[in-house]
Amino acid sequence: MTDGDILDLKPDLPDFRKEILKGLQSPSKWIHPKFFYDTNGSLLFDKITELPEYYQTRTENSLLIEKCESLSILLKDIESAVELGAGNGQKSFSLIKCLPGLKEYSLLDISISSLKGAVDYLKTAYPHIEIHGVCTDYLNPETMYMGDSTGKILIVFLGSTIGNMEKRDSINFLTSCNESMSRGDAILIGVDMKKDKAVLESAYNDSSGITARFNLNLIERIKREFCVSIPDGTFVHKAFYNEDIGRIEMHLVCTRDFSMTLDGAIIRFFKGEEIHTENSYKYTPDEFTEMLSIAGFPNPERLTDTRGYYSIFIARKP
């Protein structure tokens, strides 16, 4: 690829109508969290990352800055980096400073519009590094792009996105990454740690109500794309920490008996019925270290903040 190029692998986009019908016709109703991120949802999530209660983005970026010297030692031989779910490139900007031998940085994302902005931003900031964008389903190992470098490669997976996967899926994903790597290549992952329940629940129930709007935007999208009427207040936001499973759960709760017709199918809700919209798993250091080991990454390094809220794990393929 030429420096500054964007390679569009034309990923298969999910069928919103089909998957919404499937989820809402299930005995326990659900909507996949990938549908949060339409244009309005993406804007709302950007606002979430700036909220005082939402420590994850702020803490991760602080770690990349404060632990840059440690990262530069651990990753001094890395020549090429591939970031999965790069978004707007803000995380990339901080990390690139910590990779002294870097020659090439590839950003992978399913949104080509996000990639264009991120590539332009990083190319201006780092003109001496080859910056590429790849529009692809970065969670699909069959379309994983590993760059053009013949040197050591780093896979980057920040934003605690690994927590949105079920544990078994996380291990399978990490195993797929391992299988695409060569000996000595590295992986860097941002992971949200288990902590006080009140801190966790506050992060998903902010006082400004932005997270509630983000969750309820799914209802707005259903109204718009199915041309259906759903009165305001029919659903409310709910988020809580399930201590038994170790995850934040987000739901939409129906406030009254209600029915609607979607593509000819009658969808009925009873008062108090919930639509499960997202999980976000939290881990202890030992739990995530074990997951990495199972996936073929033994003895990872871990960098964390003083409170132990968030960790960056770095591991090599032996």
Predicted regions, residues:
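A short glycine-rich, Lys/Arg-flanked "PGG" loop and its adjoining helix->strand segment in the class I
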Residues: 171-183
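Conserved beta-strand signature within the Rossmann-like core of class I S-adenosyl-L-methionine
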Residues: 180-194
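Substrate-binding/catalytic lobe of Class I Rossmann-like enzymes that use SAM or dcSAM, i.e.
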Residues: 201-281, 285, 289-295
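N-terminal auxiliary segments of SAM/dcSAM-dependent transferases
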Residues: 1-34, 42
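Conserved SAM-binding loop of SAM-dependent methyltransferases across substrates and taxa
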Residues: 88-101
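Conserved class I S-adenosyl-L-methionine
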Residues: 77-87
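Class I SAM-dependent methyltransferase Rossmann-like catalytic core
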Residues: 29-75
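Conserved SAM/SAH-binding beta-strand->alpha-helix loop
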Residues: 108-112
